[in-house]
Amino acid sequence: MKEKIVLAYSGGLDTSVAVKWLLDKGYDVVACCLDVGEGKDLELVHQKALDMGAIECHIIDATEEFSQDYVSYAIKGNLMYEGTYPLVSALSRPLISKKLVEIASKTNSVGIAHGCTGKGNDQVRFEVAIKALDPELKVFAPVREWAWSREEEIDYAIKHNIPVPIQHDSPYSIDQNLWGRSNECGILEDPYATPPKDAYDLTNELEDAPDEAEEIVLSFEKGIPVSLDGTAYKLSELILELNKLAGKHGVGRIDHVENRLVGIKSREVYETPAAEVIMNAHKALETITLTKDVAHFKPVIEKQFSEQIYNGLWFSPLTDSLKIFVDSTQAHVTGDVRLKLYKGNAIVNGRQSPYTLYNEKLATYTKEDAFNQESAVGFIDIFGLPTKVNSMLHGGYKDEQ
């Protein structure tokens, strides 16, 4: 009896070719495809896997789990790798790995295969996660082993009658899920080349976006958005709705050269309309609900948390601890944020919360002012005392350039 390998199957170029490659190596292939909100025709993917020679194909709807257990932390933690990338693909990898391991256990498979290249981050994310969940499973990386160029891979697919939605004149590598869409390869490999229109799908060009701004109100409970303009949504549904709404206004385009885990720089084009709106709103709500010390320290945690996910370390003791900290900061991040969507921008122009720490009577400069300005004298004396003592000792501060 042949040994079984579970393949993380997307229906794209790499994994379609990988089915054929694994079959030639003498394995039975169990394909597994997760729906994490990417919007593709999964029935078509299911049939394609079987047509390619897989003995089984498991289609798993993990959209709700993805939104509740993974995207929720991206929101609560304001997670952005290098302050720019909302971790679109990176967030889904631990969940995909978890489901692959579950299928491997159910089907008595000896290992798991993925379609990642040898120079990307995903190979690390999948393999580290799989080994964290089941150290005994073998991991196969067909694309890394055959080391073909993109053009050679396309030629192989054509030669073996493998249908792939890709041609030499449009060789993009696209990954999409609920949280956004990433695009690389082709002309995008030149960091100075302007991305062509066909590189985008979720967002309008600014020239094609509506000429009138649109105001929306996003409501949060404990750091998670729960309604849009007064209508309640599940998190996954709210994200999909905002992707359409904000994408119409050209919101969420990111053109970024990032530092990959494997040591190279890579130009990536992302579309994250919902993520930009939600993150902007969430940060605005935190400004009135977090104490100063928490607000100043939380970005330190956010940076580390983002790097943990980007580097494939979701299943680790440190990440578990970071999640606990982030959760503890969100108890009072409840309220409403008003934003204006216009020509690529999601601009916050109002925020309110039943737990607001903003005291208008303390902040105002009108006659309603309740702030005791006389207390400033003593505060300044104490605050500036170390500076004063140092200057007394050294005869004044010398501003030497």
From Swiss-Prot:
Annotated InterPro entries: Arginosuc_syn_C, Arginosuc_syn_N, Arginosuc_synth, Arginosuc_synth_CS, Arginosuc_synth_type_1_subfam, AS_cat/multimer_dom_body, Rossmann-like_a/b/a_fold
Catalytic activity, as annotated: L-citrulline + L-aspartate + ATP = 2-(N(omega)-L-arginino)succinate + AMP + diphosphate + H(+)
Pathway(s) the chain acts in: Amino-acid biosynthesis; L-arginine biosynthesis; L-arginine from L-ornithine and carbamoyl phosphate: step 2/3
Assembly: Homotetramer.
Gene: argG
Protein name: Argininosuccinate synthase
Binding site for ATP: A8, Y9, S10, G11, G12, L13, D14, T15, S16, G115
Binding site for L-citrulline: Y85, N121, R125, S173, S182, E258, Y270
EC number of this enzyme: 6.3.4.5
Record keywords: Amino-acid biosynthesis, Arginine biosynthesis, ATP-binding, Cytoplasm, Ligase, Nucleotide-binding
A GO cellular component entry from the record: cytoplasm
Binding residues for L-aspartate: T117, N121, D122
PROSITE patterns, per the entry: ARGININOSUCCIN_SYN_1, ARGININOSUCCIN_SYN_2
HAMAP family in alphabetical order: Arg_succ_synth_type1
Location of the protein in the cell: Cytoplasm
Family per similarity comment: Belongs to the argininosuccinate synthase family. Type 1 subfamily.
GO BP terms in the entry: argininosuccinate metabolic process; L-arginine biosynthetic process; urea cycle
Species of origin: Staphylococcus saprophyticus subsp. saprophyticus (strain ATCC 15305 / DSM 20229 / NCIMB 8711 / NCTC 7292 / S-41)
GO molecular function, one term: ATP binding
